[in-house]
A protein has these predicted regions:
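Zinc-dependent metalloendopeptidases
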Residues: 2-7, 11-246
């Protein structure tokens, strides 16, 4: 029912990627950041959270006519997040801060948290369902798990296997700029695929924990239980009502 309601009430937004953000950059493969902004403290700043855990959104309806399946994935992902957390996605009315789902790209990328103005989430035709969830979780306020300050206790970065120009994407965050809510989660959709940015088809990050491997993105079905706990903790949700796995 929620999907039908959102399909009926989504709003058409007609502007191009270039006209809105001519100074945006992509780091870590899919994180959008304005050149004047600091990335690492996004989660730690209250201003980057969505007030009342409510996220207004607009969908450029005309862009999805040739690929309605991607539109379904977006709406289905929002429904699943709502079922697990106190996050609510609502069609934008007059809010200044809102998400804009845009398909005019081959990329999958998003800003981290609320940036205080219309902000795009680019969902290209090659974005899988788990990638859509990954980008929306960025927009909710979460960074990549492989940059956690404590990551060296759980994973090893294989620098020799990483493309030289992409090695910056594996830099570790410092503890002042990165908030963690759970133990390291190998099932998180925010953890890099083990072959991300490989220059030789070998793994770029591996597990240090015996008996646990880093799964491919294609093997993940959606938010992990600890992803859900992290969202609920960040937004002070009611755990008793919202902690159920789908």
């Amino acid at each position: 029912m929620r999907i039908l309601v959102k399909l009926i009430c989504f709003t058409i937004l007609l502007f191009s990627r270039k006209s809105v953000y001519c100074k945006q950059h992509v780091i870590e493969g899919d994180i959008l950041v304005h050149k004047s902004e600091l990335l690492r403290n996004a989660v730690n700043r209250e201003s980057r959270l969505w007030p009342n855990a409510t996220i207004p959104y607009k969908i450029v309806a005309s862009e999805w006519r040739e690929n309605p399946w991607m539109l379904y994935l977006i709406l289905d992902t929002m429904n699943k997040i709502e079922a697990q957390t106190c996050i609510r996605f609502v069609p934008r009315s007059d809010e200044k801060s809102f998400l804009v789902f845009n398909s005019n790209t081959s990329d999958c990328s998003s800003y981290i948290g609320r940036i205080g103005r219309p902000q795009p989430i680019y969902i290209g035709p090659r974005c899988a369902a788990v990638t859509v969830a990954h980008e929306i979780m960025h927009a909710i306020g979460f960074q990549h798990a492989h940059t956690r300050p404590d990551r060296d206790n759980f994973i090893e970065i294989l620098w020799d296997n990483i493309k030289r120009k992409k090695q910056m994407n594996f830099e570790k965050a410092n503890s002042l700029d990165y908030t963690t809510f759970t133990q390291f989660d190998f099932d998180s959709i925010m953890l890099y695929d083990p072959y991300t940015f490989s220059q030789n088809r070998k793994a770029t990050l591996i597990s240090k924990v015996p008996g646990i491997d880093i799964r491919r993105k294609s093997e993940k079905l959606g938010l992990s239980e600890m992803d859900v706990i992290s969202i609920n903790t960040l937004y002070k949700c009611d755990f008793n009502e919202k902690l159920r796995k789908y």
